[in-house]
């Protein structure tokens, strides 16, 4: 499974666009994965990179990478990132995404991915945003398949929060 960071020409989406004008926008996509994985990673992980870290304007991705490394080194137990798109609960093993506006609901259930996948995606997004905005710019990173089994609906950090979220499971 891989993530592709690139730019696309969106000029054709504008009615007043002339044939020689070029309007580009970044695009993130999951490739070499099943439809279910593409959908879930796209809906949560890639959406969070797009909505919460647009262009790394204030070095937000650099700051986040330092927090992730602090969690990995056990300098801090976990880190909660409150942002516009998602609240992200970062622990040593996984990152849980909760929609910042809708919370936990049928359209936006909690979702988690391995910390390794999250860190790779965040580092790649930072590197991508540092590159020139061009249709030739592309970054592709591979997410380790061996970590897929760690994806869980209720990782340890969520069990602690389950009562406050009024979640029920068997």
Predicted feature residues:
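Long protein-protein interaction modules used by eukaryotic assembly/scaffold proteins
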Residues: 5-6
């Amino acid at each position: 499974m891989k993530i592709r960071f690139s730019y696309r020409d969106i000029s054709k989406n504008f009615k007043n666009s002339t044939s020689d004008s070029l309007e580009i926008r970044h695009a993130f996509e999951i490739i070499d994965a099943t439809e279910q994985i593409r959908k879930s990673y796209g809906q949560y992980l890639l959406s969070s990179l797009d909505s919460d870290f647009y262009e790394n304007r204030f070095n937000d991705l650099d700051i986040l990478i330092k927090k992730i490394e602090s969690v990995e080194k056990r300098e801090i137990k976990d880190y909660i990132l409150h942002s516009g798109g998602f609240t992200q609960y970062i622990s040593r093993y996984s990152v849980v995404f909760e929609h910042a506006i809708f919370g936990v609901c049928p359209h936006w259930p909690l979702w988690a991915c391995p910390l390794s996948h999250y860190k790779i995606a965040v580092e790649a997004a930072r590197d991508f945003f540092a590159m020139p905005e061009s249709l030739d710019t592309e970054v592709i990173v591979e997410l380790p398949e061996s970590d897929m089994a760690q994806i869980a609906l209720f990782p340890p950090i969520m069990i602690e929060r389950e009562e406050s979220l009024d979640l029920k499971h068997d």
